[in-house]
């Protein structure tokens, strides 16, 4: 059984036991989160919401709070010898999907 959930303005396809990396959520490691925005549930029978599946939820546990690898942002202006190099590390949360209920 799998589900499509919406969090952080993005949609993710998840199944029980999966690990999912999403935008940072304000929870500590070990917390349980319930996602009510379930767009679709698949498996033997497919349920597609309009826009959400009524009564469906996905339960996940916070596994890791961390940061991504550094990306480098380089800005320059032509013919001016003006250059700027900036590094950025985005915060993320890793979730373990525990239960999909419809």
Swiss-Prot record:
Recite the UniProt keywords alphabetically.
Ribonucleoprotein, Ribosomal protein, RNA-binding, rRNA-binding
Give the top-rank taxon of the lineage listed in the UniProt record for this protein: Bacteria
Q: Kindly give the InterPro entries that the UniProt entry links to this protein.
A: bL21-like (IPR028909), bL21-like_sf (IPR036164), Ribosomal_bL21 (IPR001787), Ribosomal_bL21_CS (IPR018258)
Q: Which GO terms describe its molecular function?
A: rRNA binding; structural constituent of ribosome
GO BP: any one term: translation
Note whether RNA-binding occurs among the keywords.
yes
GO CC annotation: what is one?
ribonucleoprotein complex
Keyword Ribosomal protein in record? yes
Q: How does it assemble?
A: Part of the 50S ribosomal subunit. Contacts protein L20.
Q: Which family does it belong to?
A: Belongs to the bacterial ribosomal protein bL21 family.
What role does it play? This protein binds to 23S rRNA in the presence of protein L20.
Protein name in the entry: Large ribosomal subunit protein bL21
Q: What is the native source organism of this protein?
A: Trichlorobacter lovleyi (strain ATCC BAA-1151 / DSM 17278 / SZ) (Geobacter lovleyi)
């Amino acid at each position: 059984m799998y589900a499509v959930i919406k969090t952080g303005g993005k949609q993710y396809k998840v199944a029980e036991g999966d690990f999912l990396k999403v935008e940072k959520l304000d929870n500590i490691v070990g917390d349980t989160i319930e996602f009510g925005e379930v767009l679709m549930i698949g498996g033997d029978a497919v349920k597609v919401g309009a826009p959400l599946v009524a009564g469906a939820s996905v339960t996940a546990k916070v596994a890791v709070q961390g940061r991504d690898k550094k990306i480098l942002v380089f800005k320059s202006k032509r013919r001016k010898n003006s250059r700027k190099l900036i590094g950025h590390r985005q915060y993320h949360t890793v979730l373990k999907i525990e239960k999909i209920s419809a």
